[in-house]
């Protein structure tokens, strides 16, 4: 009873000390971290449902812990389904979080930004605004280079009529993310490269649930790619495997991440 009361008291104190912008999950983790004497590494992820699906940030923390990282990853996120960079710029919470101060800030764009002109224009216009608003202790913000949809999605009439398929979309994603990274001084996280490697070398592993959103395997792959860049090292030593994923599939996904460049 006393332990539960103490945990509740600590959570309330943290809520006032670290600000009401923090999510419930982040506050619970910070309460638990009071018993962890490793130095903290604060990470903010600004993104969409691709990030909150299967609680990818929690996977990232578990991956880091299982790999014996010397830091405890304290991860906060501002994520909304279908959110564009323009959407995030209009969100008071996102802007307040960016201004709080972090060791790392990760920007994960809308999945369809490169499928239409206005979406790509907003991506290139508001990405730099978010990056400039990020208060970092050192380094620069990071941009997730995400995966294109599954091939079947491009059979829709508008895509088919324009001759816009998966390979064209992937190429445009790479080009526009490279441009934004150059314009806004961002590091790029090579999720797309790991995704393609896993998709081609292990086609039996289902990475999406609907052609877009990640399965548990897809979220694990995404989190591994993020960790590989944050730690600037291989993920072969990661032992964490999420529920619902076999050890063999998890090993194959770790190998896919280690087979592609971490830095772009």
Which residues fall in each region the model found?
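Conserved catalytic region of serine esterases and O-acyltransferases that act on ester linkages
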Residues: 184, 207, 211-213, 217-264
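N-terminal secretory targeting modules
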Residues: 1-46, 50-58, 65, 69, ...
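Conserved SGNH/GDSL esterase-like catalytic core that processes O-acyl groups on lipids
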Residues: 40-46, 50-129, 135
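A generic local structural motif
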Residues: 29-32, 91-93, 174-175
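Alpha-helical cap/lid subdomain in secreted, periplasmic
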Residues: 95-216, 228, 237
């Amino acid at each position: 009873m006393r332990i539960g009361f103490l945990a509740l008291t600590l959570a309330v104190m943290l809520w006032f000390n670290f600000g009401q912008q923090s999510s419930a999950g982040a506050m619970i983790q910070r309460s638990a971290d009071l018993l962890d004497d490793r130095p903290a590494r604060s990470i903010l992820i600004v993104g969409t449902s691709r990030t909150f699906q299967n609680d990818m940030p929690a996977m990232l923390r578990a991956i880091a812990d299982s790999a014996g990282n010397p830091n405890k990853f304290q991860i906060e996120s501002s994520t909304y389904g279908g959110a564009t960079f323009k959407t995030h710029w209009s969100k008071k919470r996102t802007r307040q979080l960016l201004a709080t101060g972090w060791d790392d800030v990760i920007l994960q764009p809308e999945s369809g930004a490169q499928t239409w002109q206005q979406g790509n224009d907003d991506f290139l216009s508001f990405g730099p605004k978010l990056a400039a608003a990020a208060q970092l202790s050192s380094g620069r913000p990071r941009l997730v280079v995400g995966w294109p949809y599954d091939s079947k999605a491009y059979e829709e009439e508008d895509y088919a009529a324009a001759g816009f398929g998966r390979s064209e979309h992937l190429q445009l994603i790479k080009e526009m993310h490279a441009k934004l990274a150059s314009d806004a001084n961002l590091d790029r996280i090579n999720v797309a490269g790991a995704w393609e490697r896993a998709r081609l070398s292990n086609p039996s592993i289902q990475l999406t649930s609907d052609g877009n959103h990640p399965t548990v395997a897809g979220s694990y792959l995404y989190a591994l790619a993020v960790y590989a860049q944050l730690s600037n090292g291989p993920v072969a030593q990661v032992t964490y495997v999420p529920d619902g994923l076999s050890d063999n599939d998890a090993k194959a996904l770790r190998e896919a991440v280690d087979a592609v460049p971490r830095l772009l």
